[in-house]
């Protein structure tokens, strides 16, 4: 199930990992954009923070961006299949919890309005 939005820390521009990314390479700003696109991809597709290799071009990324994101600790390698966004489970709703919340809301609406879910 997809999320209509993700949580994004307002202090992201000052995050030491983002600063290391931006200050550490001439293409660091582009890699930071890939990081944000990856978060929206994971939220939209309900991947719980997993970015499959085949999705990299869809989030405006290249292998060099993935390498930089891993080097600063924003992503972690997930074998040959892709990457995991570091800290996703701590700050974002899981796909499972989103589904449970949606079902509860449907049942509550049905009870309130007398409709079957």
Give the ranges of each region predicted by the language model.
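Eukaryotic partner-binding/assembly regions in large regulatory complexes
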Residues: 104-109
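Charged, low-complexity alpha-helical linker segments
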Residues: 110-117
